[in-house]
């Protein structure tokens, strides 16, 4: 354990599942709850992922004020790089992304802005794996989305593992500035217009 800095000793693994609406703001409220209760939940689920469990389920309502407060603390206390990594990794399709992000944030708030550089740490490495997966998939879809014309509009259907439409937007808006186009993400049931 040499070289490891202990994280908040009050922090404990809790036998509870957080249930939230699946939005980024809702996730930030899960982060708020985790810090307020000094706990790492057993799991974090959305209604789409909810399943039978022996653990109690704690409903985490989305509160815009709490979400803003948590998000503002990322840049102020952890730096722009951490803010970017957490925001981007939230788009990951990984089932346990919320729990991984919460674990990382507890570590980062305990150790400070340099935590994001500790890529070999077991609570940091998964974030870089998610980022790598997102980057690879964005690059793949930027090069391989095939559009078909339908009534003067270009349309395409994609099936990504990650929720990458927000990351594809700048590329395709720049590529087709004067075109009407639509990309439908069939996996996440979302549309980029």
Q: Regions from the language model: what does each represent?
A:
Residues 2-63:
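N-terminal ordered "arm"
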Residues 18-20, 55, 84, 128, ...:
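Sequence-level detector for tyrosine residue identity
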Residues 5-7, 16-17, 31, 44, ...:
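Extended aliphatic helical segments
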Residues 45-140:
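Charged, alpha-helical interface segments at or near domain boundaries
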Residues 114-193:
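Internal, well-folded beta-alpha domain core
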């Amino acid at each position: 354990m040499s070289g490891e800095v202990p994280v908040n000793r009050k922090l404990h693994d809790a036998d509870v599942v957080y249930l939230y609406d699946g939005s980024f703001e809702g996730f930030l409220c899960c982060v708020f709850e985790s810090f307020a209760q000094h706990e790492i939940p057993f799991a974090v689920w959305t209604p789409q992922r909810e399943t039978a469990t022996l653990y109690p389920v704690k409903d985490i309502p989305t509160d815009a004020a709490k979400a803003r407060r948590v998000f503002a603390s990322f840049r102020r206390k952890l730096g722009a790089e951490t803010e970017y990594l957490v925001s981007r990794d939230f788009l990951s399709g990984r089932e346990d992304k919320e729990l991984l992000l919460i674990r990382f944030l507890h570590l980062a708030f305990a150790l400070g802005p340099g935590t994001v550089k500790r890529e070999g740490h077991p609570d940091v490495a998964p974030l870089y794996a998610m980022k790598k997966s997102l980057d690879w998939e964005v690059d793949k879809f930027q090069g391989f989305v095939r559009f078909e014309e339908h009534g003067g509009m270009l349309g395409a259907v994609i099936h990504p593992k990650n929720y990458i439409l927000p990351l594809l937007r700048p590329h395709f808006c720049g590529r087709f500035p004067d075109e009407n186009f639509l990309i439908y993400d069939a996996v996440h049931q979302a549309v980029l217009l």
